[in-house]
Amino acid sequence: MALPKFELLSLADNTVGWGPLASSSSADEPVPFQQFNKADRIGRVADWIGVDRFYRRGNERYNERVYGSAANAGSQFDYIHGMDEHNFQLVDTSKPMARNPQRNFRVRQMHLRKMMQKENEKREMVNQSTNLRMKRSIAKEQQRAFKMWQRRGGNARQGQRGQGGRFGGDRPKERLPSVQVRPEWVVLEEMNLSAFSKLALPNIPGGDDIGDHQYGSLQYYDKTIDRVSVKNSIPLQRCAGVFYNVTTTEDPVIQELAQGGAGNVFGTDIILATLMTAPRSVYSWDIVAYRVGDKLFFDKRNTRDILNPVETLTVSETSAEPPSFDGNGINNAKDLATEAFYINQNFRRQVVKRNDAGFTFKNARAPFEDEETGESGTAYKYRKWNLGNGVDGKPVELVCRTELDGVIHGLGNETQTLTIKAFNEWDSTQSGGVDWRTKLDVQKGAVMATEIKNNSAKVAKWTLQALLAGSDTMKLGYVSRNNARSTQNHSILLTQYVKPTEFASNIALNMDNCWGILRCVIDSCMKQKPGKYLLMKDPQSPVIRLYSLPEGTFESERESSDEENSDDDQ
């Protein structure tokens, strides 16, 4: 079978020019053709000028590739009007109106005041918005990281609760214990701090002074300090003085009272205040308890640091974002506590009349004070409370060494005792508080409320120390850094008087609950055999554990600290 024959069609070839022939054949008649017109707007093969047609969507792309359309034309074909109308100018030939120059001056003065007011408002808005911008940027970064975490699966494997048992896997911050627990220590009891809020021991009368056991001399308060304000601040001076840090068992007065049967439970005001405010504390602390016969001594460990964890003046402990315990820089919890200690020691000495005659108690010096080193500027009163019958049916008689910082002339020239403490501002942008230098004069209550919220445990301890000592008034100071990046220089911005009983109700400090907590701890220790025990607040959970300690625990630390003190004296 023969295959079909393939024949090529004949094509018209223009040998004398470019383009089709002038006379088309019959084969080309069905093909439409339009003659070339010079008025047509012809685009280019690659038009890089007409960029306005790129990224068009939907019906906007209609007719953009039609021959002669405006979308294919370059800007070189656009019509430009040659006449420049900017050269024309209208001339006002009317006669100007005469104006009152005094009125113009008043108008200009009013405009100037408005401009200055707007400028001041703008500056305040900029200062206030700086922190807001920082918080917004941090929130955006956290939101971005959270979205990235969700894209990668999130906590799908762990359900709604992640590691640590908290919603979204929010693990608690790592806090170090105040003392390292050793394997030979035995846990005898765990006390849940959340249950402490339900305890109450009502009808506890005020403490009584024990005989003539009142020691020291105090200076009168300098009332010129009350004129201090943010605008009239004064620098915090570095006042020389002695600070005595005597434990309960080393106090010769307490030893004498214990031998004389003055009580069966002994402690200092700061130790008892720490126990009574335990539900408010966040950081770890520890208290040593000695059971000797039918008596109980609450004591503190001898550490190489200036202060024991019980006496540490924590800063922003109960805030939403507390400082890291041992981080880099000057704003870690340990260095801030040391700074607060020096501020309080200098503040309580600066606000009294150190060169004038003071008020002397029945004994000018305490037995543990050294005559050669000088006075400490602190008075000590030994007081006693009856806390009812204990677990063995015998009455619980509490003996406490309390401290006072100054005296002041009250109504009728009556001498009243003072407890002097100071708040310290370190960096308002990091502490979550308010700027004292802008808010303290006009919003003192808001600043105090913020400090009470961020330092709930410390403020409660101060109030309890004043109540245990029978202090008539508390004097609170506000001390701020001159430079947020330096801890060398500080200024006193303001001072404030508060009554201890009224202040306790303002900070929701219930004395019946505090006595109930202390009595619960005393009963737990009294149930144990004579020996040495340790009460330690857990750093991660609201729990106090009672440990039984072997004989000789912490004795090496005591000996090493004594050797260091003897070397310093030499």
From Swiss-Prot:
Family label: Belongs to the eIF-3 subunit D family.
Entry superkingdom: Eukaryota
Subunit structure: Component of the eukaryotic translation initiation factor 3 (eIF-3) complex.
GO biological process per UniProt: cap-dependent translational initiation; formation of cytoplasmic translation initiation complex; translational initiation
Predominant location: cytoplasm
Function noted in UniProt: mRNA cap-binding component of the eukaryotic translation initiation factor 3 (eIF-3) complex, which is involved in protein synthesis of a specialized repertoire of mRNAs and, together with other initiation factors, stimulates binding of mRNA and methionyl-tRNAi to the 40S ribosome. The eIF-3 complex specifically targets and initiates translation of a subset of mRNAs involved in cell proliferation. In the eIF-3 complex, eif3d specifically recognizes and binds the 7-methylguanosine cap of a subset of mRNAs.
Acidic residues composition-biased segments: 560-570
Compartments where located: Cytoplasm
Free-text note on domains in this protein's UniProt record: The RNA gate region regulates mRNA cap recognition to prevent promiscuous mRNA-binding before assembly of eif3d into the full eukaryotic translation initiation factor 3 (eIF-3) complex.
Any GO CC annotation of this UniProt entry: eukaryotic translation initiation factor 3 complex
InterPro entries in UniProt: eIF3d
Ranges of biased composition (kind: Low complexity): 151-160
Residue span of region Disordered: 150-175, 551-570
Keywords, alphabetical: Cytoplasm, Initiation factor, Protein biosynthesis, RNA-binding
Protein name (record): Eukaryotic translation initiation factor 3 subunit D
Record carries keyword RNA-binding: yes
Region (RNA gate): 309-323
Gene: eif-3.D
Gene Ontology molecular function: mRNA cap binding; translation initiation factor activity
